[in-house]
């Protein structure tokens, strides 16, 4: 996997994981096959950064760093969910986080709106992220139960324009337009589709950084609602 995306390794750094399962791999044979495709003059700084990443993840420090990433991603999701509730309650629109709208505490049976759920519940209970059949939010009608779940740190937000059934609505905000606006402010999403924008939370993403993202999305909404001429907000288009 790409260690430069989620761990603190240099760009282009990655690991190959060899699992000692029922069909064990002959390491010598694997190594020879790997060397056929590897350079004999690697950039040793990249190799060293992988070693540093391993040391950082060793023991409790790795658990703490990973938990911080999950906590920040969940805080961002909840902030977006609260803004979505606030704007839609006034008959307006906003971007919606793609996750469950309601979660249940398995210990107490109490149900919470996602925006108001305890952080500990969302960061420790796996069922808060599982896609169950019959739920409309994920759009997969025939998905087997407990077959798939969201990764909390891969945060997708939905722009208005497509219903939960996958059908286009009468009006909407193209995600590509939002991505262009974010790019003008130095924010590069991980992926953009028709009405969905994904952001990958990793080590180093702090409340200050995702707070800037929230403010930039709010500024897009202000310009959109004011019908500001495109030539003023994005003249390069």
Regions found by a protein language model. Name each.
Residues 6, 22-24, 56, 161, ...:
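Short loop/turn segments at secondary-structure transitions that flank enzyme active sites
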Residues 1-33, 38-49:
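Active-site PLP attachment segment
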Residues 60-237:
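Non-catalytic terminal extensions of PLP-dependent enzymes
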């Amino acid at each position: 996997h790409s260690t430069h995306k989620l761990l603190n390794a240099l760009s282009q750094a990655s690991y190959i994981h060899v699992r000692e399962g029922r069909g064990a791999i002959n390491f010598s044979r694997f190594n020879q096959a790997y060397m056929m495709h590897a350079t004999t003059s690697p950039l040793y700084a990249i190799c060293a950064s992988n070693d540093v990443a391993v040391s950082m993840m060793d023991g409790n420090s790795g658990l703490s760093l990973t938990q911080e990433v999950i906590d920040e991603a969940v805080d961002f999701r909840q902030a977006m969910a609260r803004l979505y509730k606030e704007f839609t309650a006034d008959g307006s629109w906003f971007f919606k986080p793609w996750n469950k709208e309601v979660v249940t505490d398995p210990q107490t049976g109490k149900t919470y709106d996602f925006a108001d759920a305890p952080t500990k519940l969302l960061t420790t209970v796996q069922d808060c992220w599982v896609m169950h059949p019959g739920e409309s939010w994920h759009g997969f009608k025939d998905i087997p139960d407990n077959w798939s779940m969201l990764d909390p740190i891969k945060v997708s937000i939905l722009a208005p324009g497509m219903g939960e059934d996958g059908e286009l609505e009468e009006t909407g905000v193209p995600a590509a337009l939002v991505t262009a606006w974010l790019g003008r402010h130095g924010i590069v999403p991980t992926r953009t589709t028709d009405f969905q924008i994904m952001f990958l939370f990793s080590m180093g993403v702090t409340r200050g950084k995702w707070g800037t993202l929230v403010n930039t999305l709010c500024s897009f909404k202000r310009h959109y609602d004011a019908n500001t001429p495109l030539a003023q907000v994005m003249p390069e288009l």
